[in-house]
Every structure is written in structure tokens, then in C-alpha cells.
């Protein structure tokens, strides 16, 4: 590895980052608009009830009180949901940038060790306080990502975001599970039921735990340290419709020809693991199979 190779590598790796971050920020802005509209709706209904009480007293019930309260509660729940989605998007952007920054700093350090690049006279170091603040920002996100996914190899595509996590080499190797169709189907259903606590615990992070979903604590440092200085063995594959790295809990599609193979629970609306004998297809494969059935009937 030399300086020109590193430069070329990161020029390519970072070429799509601005578009990814811009997409995430646009999504956050869109959800902000939805939050504002929902707030206006429930505040208007609340004012309507208060106006009626001021006019008629507290003993007289508004003729549409139950309907209004139901609508207010519905909008408040929507606002909570949208706020959690905004946190997810913001942390996805944070992770994307942090991932590239960490690998870049790792390669720079290697070039300096090999005396291919002179070190900075006054290197900028991340203080322990900064590390703790960064860790807390991700720890605070754990509530909004409580239903997350266990990885498997998938085809790479342009990453576009919806959720986020750290790079970590998994205890389970799913490559061998797809050696034959019979073994693959069985292994797929077994892996789908694996929970986050069944994944190998990573090494601790110096500046604070980057806890995610309460059970899986991951950090960029620990993932790279466990897999070599350059993180060469780290799982950098992209999975799911959102085309992000594996994190948390994931579910595998039982269609052997599935394009994505593995999906984050939050991306496909899964909140609990499937039963032992349950077969699960992703929305894409399920739609294709339904079309095939209709064609056969015709």
C-alpha cells in the first residue's frame, strides 16, 4: 500500500457519500414536515375541546369528545414514530461518516508506520470526553432501533439509507450454509431465529460502549482491532433493501434466488422471530411469487 493507492481508494469510496448523506437529510426534513402537520392537527382538536369547556363548563360533554381524543392520540403516536425514525436516519448518517473516517485514519496510521507518509507535527487526537459524547449519542438511539438484525452474504449495490451499526465479524458463517439447496433452506430458517445475544461479543471500546439494542455492543475500534489493522476481515457486505452493513437482528429470505438474501427486521416490519417451521419470503420475492401464481392460473 502506498499514498497514491490510499488516495485512489478513498476517492472512490467517498464518491457516493455526499448523495447518501443528502438523501438521509432530505428524509429527515420530510419527516419534520409530517411531524409539524400532525402537531397542528392535534393542537387544533385540543383547542376545540378547551373552547367548548370554557363555553359550556366541565360537566357538559362535547358531542364528538371521544372521536377528538382518539384522533389526538393517533396523531401523538404518529409524531413519536416519526421522531424515532428521524433519530434512526441521523444515526445512519453519523455511522456512514464515522466508518469512512475510521478506515481512513487507520490507513494513514499504517502509511506513517511504514514511513511512506510523514506524521503530522501536531496530531489531532480525539479526547476521552469526545469519545464518551460520541458513544452516548449512539447509546441514546438504542430505543428507536430495538428491532434490528444477524448477517449473511448479500450482493453489493449502491448504499442508500434507512438504519446502522458497526462493522463486526460474526461468529456465524452463513456462506457454508448455502452449499446445497437442502442445507441452505434448513440453515436459513435456523439463522433467522438467532437473536443478538447469540452473536460473538466484540472487544470493549475505550471511550464508552456503543450499545445497540441492549445486547449487541459494537464499536468501530473493536471491530477493526479484532480483524486486523485495516479491518480486512470485517463484514463490509451490504444487505437488505436499504443496502447497509449488517447489524442487530436480521431475517433471511427462504427464496434461494433472492437478490438481497438478508434483511433488517426494521426494514421489513418484523418485530419477533419466525417459528421453527415457518417459511418467510421478503416482500420482493413474495410479490414475484404471487405474480407467477396468477400467470399459472391464467
Curated annotation (Swiss-Prot):
Gene3D superfamilies reported in the protein's UniProt record: 6.10.140.1740, Zinc/RING finger domain, C3HC4 (zinc finger)
One GO molecular-function entry: histone H3K4me3 reader activity
Keyword check for Transmembrane helix: no
Site (Histone H3K4me3 binding): 239, 250, 254, 262
Matches recorded under SUPFAM superfamilies: FYVE/PHD zinc finger
Gene Ontology cellular-component terms listed: cytosol; NuA4 histone acetyltransferase complex; nucleosome; nucleus; piccolo histone acetyltransferase complex
Assembly notes: Interacts with H3K4me3 and to a lesser extent with H3K4me2. Component of the NuA4 histone acetyltransferase complex.
Coiled coil residues, start to end: 20-86
PANTHER family: CHROMATIN MODIFICATION-RELATED PROTEIN YNG2, INHIBITOR OF GROWTH PROTEIN
Gene source species: Candida albicans (strain SC5314 / ATCC MYA-2876) (Yeast)
Region listing for Disordered, in residue ranges: 140-206
Keywords: Cell cycle, Chromatin regulator, Coiled coil, DNA damage, DNA repair, Meiosis, Metal-binding, Nucleus, Zinc, Zinc-finger
Compartments in which it is found: Nucleus
Comment field on protein domains: The PHD-type zinc finger mediates the binding to H3K4me3.
Main localization, broad class: nucleus
Skewed-composition ranges (Polar residues): 140-158
Composition skew (Low complexity), residue ranges: 174-188
Protein family: Belongs to the ING family.
Positions that bind Zn(2+) 2: 253, 258, 282, 285
Name of the protein this chain belongs to: Chromatin modification-related protein YNG2
